């Protein structure tokens, strides 16, 4: 399953419409078009959306490549300091789980925080993934938070 670009936290209806006019309808599309600086610049010129926003959204899209990470958990991970799959693969699951709990207590981003077991699965999966290759066979689903 692939999420619509409007599901990314921070992408409002107006931005989603601009992105769709530029051919970006899904999280997959956003990641493919904006994972590199050149692509972000082109999309920014086409849509008028600042590159810094496109970069933030592409980071969230990157994290959503990992099974179990959807829009809410990608936002929580970003708030906890994890911006990319590469960074996720370097984390210690127990520490990351605690950081996510602390961040969520302060910011109330999700209804629940994933278990250490779930975070361990994410970290292990992230270690096997390339930085900029979308795994089309990898479902992008998030368990209900």
Per-range role (PLM):
Residues 1-145:
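C-terminal extensions
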């Amino acid at each position: 399953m692939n999420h619509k670009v409007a599901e990314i936290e921070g992408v409002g209806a107006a931005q989603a419409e601009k992105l769709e006019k530029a051919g970006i309808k899904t999280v997959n599309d956003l990641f493919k078009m904006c994972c590199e600086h050149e692509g972000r610049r082109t999309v920014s010129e086409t849509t008028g959306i600042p590159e810094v926003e496109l970069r933030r959204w592409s980071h969230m899209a990157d994290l959503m490549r990992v099974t179990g990470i959807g829009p809410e958990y990608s936002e929580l991970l970003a708030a906890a300091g994890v911006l990319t799959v590469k960074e996720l693969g370097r984390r210690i699951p127990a520490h990351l789980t605690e950081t996510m709990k602390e961040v969520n207590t302060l910011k109330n981003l999700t209804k629940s925080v994933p278990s250490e077991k779930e975070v361990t699965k994410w970290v292990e999966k992230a270690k096997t993934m390339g930085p900029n290759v979308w795994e089309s066979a990898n479902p992008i689903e998030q368990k209900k938070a």
